[in-house]
Structures are given as structure tokens and as C-alpha cells.
């Protein structure tokens, strides 16, 4: 633990097209090898597809999808008397949103479709309909926390 004051995270600039911090966060997560322009093309293309499929504003749909896969509880390992316990803890808001975006992008990459635009748009649509890998991960994390509810008194 640092002895000095905690470092405040830098605020994320909103993306230029939609003016949304969430879209900027997704762009940064999609970006590989510093190629932000191609990441923007992918995310904006996926948002256009989502908007045309749903007939709603794409940023609103993305926010709803992220909200659907945002975890409430997670487990953290805690060592007590030589045994490791999986202790359920509430997820801080910033970490919860980061995890949701990470899961959406990671499971979009793992899909078998062709092209990242298709993968990302379909993963967002699946998350919106409470399906897909990202929603399954959220459900698994929540189930794990519920299964270990007996160790909640080890919370720190």
C-alpha cells in the first residue's frame, strides 16, 4: 500500500462522434497495438449495426447491454488460518463497469463469426437479450458469490 495519497484516475475523454464516455471506454478496450483509428471504425460500425437492428439510439442500446452484464457481487480470495476462502464482496461501481466492458469485448473476440464488427454487434445484442458469453460470465460470478455466502462474515 502506498504511503502517500492515493492516485486519482484520469477522467476519460468522451468520444467525438457520440459524446459518450462509455463508447470511448469500449474503443480503448477494442484497440490493439495502439491502432485507435481502426478500433473506432470497429466500434462505430458495430454501433451502426446495433442501431439499425433495434431501431433505437445505438449508445442507449450499448448502455443497456453494459448494464445487463454489470456484476453486482464477486468473490475474492481470503486466507484464514491456513485455508483459502472465496469471500463474496460487492463490486465497486467503477470496477463493475470496467469488468462489463472487458467481458463484452473479450467474448466478442472469442465469437466464431467473421469480422470484429459483426462479433461486437452480435455480442451487444446478445447481452441486451440476456444471452451470450458476457451475460453467462456475469451469471457465473454471481452464482459463485451466492454459493459462498456462508463466508461473507470474513469480509474486510
Predicted regions and their residues:
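Strongly charged
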Residues: 1-33, 37-40, 44-156
Amino acid at each position: 500500500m502506498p504511503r502517500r495519497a492515493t492516485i486519482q484516475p484520469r477522467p476519460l475523454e468522451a468520444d467525438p462522434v457520440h459524446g459518450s464516455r462509455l463508447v470511448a471506454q469500449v474503443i480503448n478496450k477494442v484497440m490493439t497495438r495502439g491502432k485507435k483509428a481502426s478500433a473506432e471504425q470497429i466500434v462505430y460500425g458495430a454501433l451502426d449495426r446495433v442501431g439499425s437492428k433495434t431501431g433505437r439510439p445505438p449508445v442507449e442500446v450499448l448502455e443497456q447491454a453494459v448494464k445487463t452484464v454489470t456484476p453486482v457481487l464477486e468473490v475474492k480470495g481470503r486466507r484464514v488460518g491456513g485455508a483459502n476462502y472465496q469471500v463474496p464482496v460487492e463490486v465497486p461501481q467503477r470496477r463493475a463497469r470496467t469488468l462489463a466492458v472487458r467481458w463484452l469485448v473479450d467474448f466478442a473476440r472469442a465469437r466464431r463469426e467473421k469480422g470484429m464488427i459483426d462479433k461486437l454487434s452480435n455480442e451487444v445484442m446478445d447481452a441486451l437479450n440476456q444471452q451470450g458469453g458476457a451475460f453467462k460470465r456475469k451469471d457465473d460470478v454471481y452464482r459463485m458469490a451466492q454459493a459462498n455466502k456462508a463466508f461473507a462474515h470474513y469480509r474486510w
